[in-house]
Amino acid sequence: MTVSERLIPSPQGDPTLIVIPTYNEMETLPDILTRVWAHVPHAHILIVDDSSPDGTGEWVDSRREDEERLHVLHRPAKSGLATAYVDGMGWGIEQGYPFILQMDADGSHRPVDLPKLLARMAGPDKPDLVIGSRWVPGGAINGWSSKRVALSKAGNYYVRFCLGTPVKDATAGLRLHRSAFLAQHEVLGRVATTGFGFQVEMTELERSLGAVITEVPITFDERIAGESKLDSSIFVEELVMVTKGGLGRLTQAARRAFSK
């Protein structure tokens, strides 16, 4: 019997793997697991832990003893969000999960929104990527200042301007992937970023490779416990990556124009 045959199907008919990177998330993770399974009881969860000093990884190990839906990858040191997702999603593809969902461990993503992404993935257009978006009609953010909202909107506008993507929330962290598309195009092997720029890079990689991308509205909550992993280097990484992409796009357009 294969791994896929042993999996319990989700309400949408196929097993889904939820990948959650962690680093010192003991304050939030236990509650998140409970809430996730309350809304998507048939989903499997993979924790990718970077040797959290607060014992997050050890807690997951103990929880796994009586929970077959829970899995863990232990990494030797803090190595960045992008590599955590690449490792976790790669594991999911190898294990035969047809759908892989990215989710934060800090409580920012509401488990109640997960069925919406799963239902949209089952739509007749068979999307390859479903993004939980703050910036489409019906999307919302709780706990952010007006300045932070404006910066996020401006950042996403800059991404759309530079990269020519129609996606309204390219920096969103809650997203559902079709594994077959990732595997067919070897998307994970093309990732160059190490941090939070991963979200923008994955959006552009999948779009440029012909993915069918759609967005569904979600409510994003500001972290209420633990420490934020965001710092200025993350924004610099995203800015440099997007600007390079925009310049490359303009260069290609100019070459096409002059070659006519």
Regions of interest found by a model, annotated:
Residues 1-13, 188-260:
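Hydrophobic helical membrane-anchoring modules
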Residues 1-35:
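N-proximal low-complexity "stem/linker" segments adjacent to membrane-targeting elements
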Residues 15-17, 44, 201:
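Cell-envelope/extracellular polymer assembly enzymes that use nucleotide-activated donors
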Residues 27-31, 54-63:
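Acidic helix N-cap motif at the loop->helix transition within catalytic regions
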Residues 33, 42-52, 73-74:
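Short beta-strand/loop segment that forms part of the nucleotide-sugar
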Residues 49-58, 77, 107:
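A conserved acidic beta->alpha catalytic loop
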Residues 73-94, 99, 111-196, 223-233:
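Acceptor/aglycone-binding surface of glycosyltransferases and processive sugar-polymer synthases
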